[in-house]
Amino acid sequence: ECELNSDYDVLALESLPDDYLPRTNYVPICDEAEYARRTPNVPWNAHLPVTRFSRLAFRRQLSQSGERTLISSILPPGFGHINTVNSLTFRKSNAAVGFASFCTSVVFDFFCKSTGRADAYESFLRELVFPLERLTPASFARTLALNCLTTHYAELWRECWNEAFRTETW
């Protein structure tokens, strides 16, 4: 159980179960139906909640004095988050993974640091331009391998799979 912000689990990737989920103290204060009602829908379909898609989540506070400024993670479908996190939903899974790849780059991080902004609200995140067509299969393979380790990401792997991944080396 988490009681302090310093309470972390030491994890060995080799021994984690395939369906591992990190622990959390977050519990919605409403029932499941109300939570679903409060969940926003994607802009391209008023009947699909954002939680039906893999999303790219960002720590809202930009760490201007830290080693990394823009901190992001890929959320699998079905997961929500608290208001200190912002997330973007993409129509196509490869766009989400591609944007995640750019967000881990030194170039994007430097840009975010150079703005001096304290928070990464959705309007700021939408300013970040990413030329998806310039990414190589290696970028996609590495982003998926570093972010999507459990069965919760199986659908994302299927949607983004490229046979070129088989020839990638580290």
Model segments located where?
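S-adenosyl-L-methionine
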Residues: 1-170
